[in-house]
């Protein structure tokens, strides 16, 4: 896709990257021609104009080394968060074709959660490959793996072996059910984990079935994000003089933790275990989405009375003619009034009507639209790298900004460089090549 207000960097401003190799000119979504490129507030612009920024020399986690074992879903997302913050991530990939690893775009990897890595290809069924993996682990601060419990132990790479060789190591383990328990060895996916957590039962319309919330709650929010948080906390402990340890991140527990506020509301008698009957699940007519006259949608959430009043004014409705906002018996009438009002104009017209207000109303944007929205454009919230529009690293650090994201590597693409940077000498790397292990330049 194309995005508006793009600045095409001069090729001299691209990256001749000594770490990743190759030249990477790029474009970034910015706020327009009149923006002050030196004001330091638009992080997307800073990313675009950095000239001397080796990918692993920037970011708040610069200097932290991570060994990631190839996986799908939450573990790569958690590792992406660390890599976006500047960690030096070496991913150990299986010896398969790059096309087997993820989506492609014009010959380049379009797997955004795989960005900012370097790849070493190892066949972990071979003792020589396991030996290389252990050498990397000895040099690492963090290991991330997302296999079923017991897999790493069977490979000879489990935490007991790893921590014996590197006592300061943080060993992150990402699973659905956790490392222990009667279901630990069972297969599953995001939807299964959030079903068992209790969260899925609360998502969906009144009288309808539970609805999958994409794979955001289990895989990413309750999985990879909490894995990264746990790893960072364990790193702080090590830097304070503590020992390395295992971080057991289970999506069932992570998803349940994301629902902590709901558990509190339930305990306080303010939540019904009936979908679509509560304030935050679409039960309240003033916390829901409404169709507009052109078949698009607006999202409304004016919980506070002062915001609610502004919304009514802009909708052309009078509070005096409607049931009280918090009178549940009147919610059906409120929903009818809001439905009729929003159908009276297009989404664009409603956007213009609510512009600048505190009514807590926003358009429901598609992904491509989100990258073009003026607010995101002004902040540089999206960036285009090798033809792939994607979110910039978040959160943003104003004192130690993240480097320009690099696309996910092909298998073994930068293995030789990664091994050299991690202390393997040229002779050792050449011996590994002779053994048939797949390293790139």
Model-flagged regions — what are they?
Residues 37, 49-240, 410, 416-441:
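N-terminal helix-loop segment corresponding to the beta1-alpha1 unit
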Residues 179, 208-218, 239-255, 275-282, ...:
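Conserved Rossmann-fold dehydrogenase catalytic segment
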Residues 197, 223-244, 257, 261-269, ...:
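Oxidoreductase and adenylate-handling cofactor-binding alpha/beta cores
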Residues 281, 285-357, 361:
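Aromatic-enriched alpha-helical interface/lid elements that frame and gate functional surfaces
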Residues 292-296, 337, 347-348, 393-441:
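An anion-binding loop in the catalytic cleft
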Residues 355-405:
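A glycine-rich dinucleotide-binding beta-alpha-beta segment and adjacent secondary-structure elements
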